[in-house]
Amino acid sequence: MLESPVSLKYITPEEPNGWLSPSASKNTDWSEYYLNLEDPHWGFKSFNDFFTRAIRPEARPIDSRSNSIVHSSDSSPLHFSSEIYGKNPSFNVQPESQFWLKDNEYSVYDMFGAEEREVKDLVDEHFVGGTIYQAILCPWYYHRWHAPVSGTIIKSYRIGGKYFMLNPSCGLGGLHEGIENYVKSLPMLSMVSVRQVIIIRIDDGSGRLVALIEIGMTEVSSCCPTVEEGQYVNKGDQLGYFQYGGSSYALVFDKDLELEFNPNIYIPN
């Protein structure tokens, strides 16, 4: 249904319910996208066409410094200090943790679905003791993923999982509490939801790795890679996109990478 013209009912600039209306667009700069403003739906053919829209390259200039790592997607950081978002990026992550507990510890074996010997060996060698950064995409964000570093894709695979999960230690609660608990459940979702794992060997001769884990959330989100194993990507190249609904992603960094996070990041309400 979300691929059909029927789904365009609310993809209009009309108030009060149009996704393209001024009130709905206060967080979106439409000049960044390819649009046909003469069309009643601005050129979109379906809701999913709107959701997966491409962006103009000049709208997201890529940091060219060789020692920089960039965000994979338009997103809000999950691990910056506030009551809702919890703690800072997780360092020295463990191979296995009781991730359903309130501390929301990350378990890299579960994140990577490390059942195959090849994957488990990669996780043991590079990611146990490494660093995890997780972020969330809001519905109005740009929903394509891009390479955080330049390098060669050595693994790309999908893990089947669950949709619309909550950490059982949080509960549901009312509307505001329910949203807050859903955000608090996001670390757990990185280990139990449907997700796409892409592992990149950094092009610096060190052999170090960066993994991108794209996480499908809610009941209809899906992960669609556009790259293959063995492919070389430049920092900022497209890797894939989300369809239909809510999403999050995690960057997992090699234990031998020395990282400095930029605290000057805008966190929307």
Feature map (PLM): residue ranges:
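Contiguous, well-folded functional domains in the mature portion of proteins
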Residues: 1-269
